[in-house]
């Protein structure tokens, strides 16, 4: 019998979800931040190419990068501001055996300097303006839904600077 290291197994406060008939597995908390339908929709929409170097802004649990793993690309740098979610994304990358293709970086998009350009930048960014509306008591959930640590304008500005010539960007963002 083979056992996985404890870090790649869900604990009592987590769930294990499977996609693509179990080819991609994702651990996420039962409460707090949980990815929505936007994540698989974004992953399906993104067209990758062999050799693509990609950057994900706000990876959360790593779900979009993980779902992209069934498509051709060289590597994804998955940027995440929140330490707990960055660690969860690392666990999910390890769980799926993707350390050679997905690197999770804990950092702030407003100060992140990758030192290279990317063929593709993608994100499922927060889209509720600042601290408007209902803020969840979960700081993790609020940061994922509200523009508390960067606006869409800042995300687009930074994306423009990170794209290689001919690069592409993909975002999930409401029409209004």
What is the predicted function of each stretch?
Residues 7-49:
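Class I SAM-dependent transferase core
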Residues 51-58:
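Conserved class I S-adenosyl-L-methionine
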Residues 61-74:
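Conserved SAM-binding loop of SAM-dependent methyltransferases across substrates and taxa
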Residues 75-80:
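Conserved SAM-binding motif I beta-strand of class I
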Residues 89-90:
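Conserved SAM-binding loop
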Residues 111-121:
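A short acidic, Gly/Pro-enriched loop at the edge of an enzyme's catalytic core
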Residues 125-154, 158:
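Mobile active-site "lid"/loop adjacent to the S-adenosyl-L-methionine
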Residues 149-176:
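Conserved Class I SAM-dependent methyltransferase catalytic core
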